[in-house]
Amino acid sequence: MPLKLAVYPGSFDPVTYGHLDIIDRGLKIFDGVIVAVARNSEKNALFTVQERIELLTEILKDRPEARVETFDGLLVDYVRRVGASVVIRGLRAVSDFEFEFQLAQMNRNITRDVETLFMMTSVPYSYLSSSIVKEVSCLNGPVDKLVPPLVKSALDAKFRG
């Protein structure tokens, strides 16, 4: 029986405990989860794509069923190319739903071979976003409960040299 793979796409700039929660929950459902770092989200990124890949790879090293890759272009093309059939998306609030629903419908319009699975963010992370983490860290606020220690160190290096 073939492995059931899912793709969890995002910018992960930086990865947060909210992202890791979705990955871990996805691994309970699927045989493998590909964490796909979007190359085309480079515009206002704090971390380069390579830095994000390195952070994610190190953080996920004890999760052999999760692998980190990059992609550009249409997500559904990438999903089909890697042999997956499901896209995982985390929803923090109703405000996320409208945008995510539109993306899922567009992907469905392009191909019926790819499904989107919406996962509600666990309550402790319902407010958490990479943007909030960057802003708090930039202002020298505490982010140790929001991101893994490796990410906190990387943020400190970016903002405080």
UniProtKB/Swiss-Prot annotation:
SUPFAM superfamilies assigned: Nucleotidylyl transferase
Record-marked site positions (Transition state stabilizer): 19
Residues given in the record as substrate binding sites: 11, 43, 75, 89
GO biological process: coenzyme A biosynthetic process
Catalytically driven reaction(s): (R)-4'-phosphopantetheine + ATP + H(+) = 3'-dephospho-CoA + diphosphate
Keyword set includes Magnesium: yes
CC terms in the record's Gene Ontology section: cytoplasm
Principal location class: cytoplasm
EC number: 2.7.7.3
InterPro entries: Cyt_trans-like (IPR004821), PPAT (IPR001980), Rossmann-like_a/b/a_fold (IPR014729)
EC supergroup of this enzyme: transferase
UniProt family annotation: Belongs to the bacterial CoaD family.
PANTHER family the record matches: PHOSPHOPANTETHEINE ADENYLYLTRANSFERASE
Function recorded in the entry: Reversibly transfers an adenylyl group from ATP to 4'-phosphopantetheine, yielding dephospho-CoA (dPCoA) and pyrophosphate.
Name assigned to this protein: Phosphopantetheine adenylyltransferase
Record organism: Citrifermentans bemidjiense (strain ATCC BAA-1014 / DSM 16622 / JCM 12645 / Bem) (Geobacter bemidjiensis)
Gene this chain is encoded by: coaD
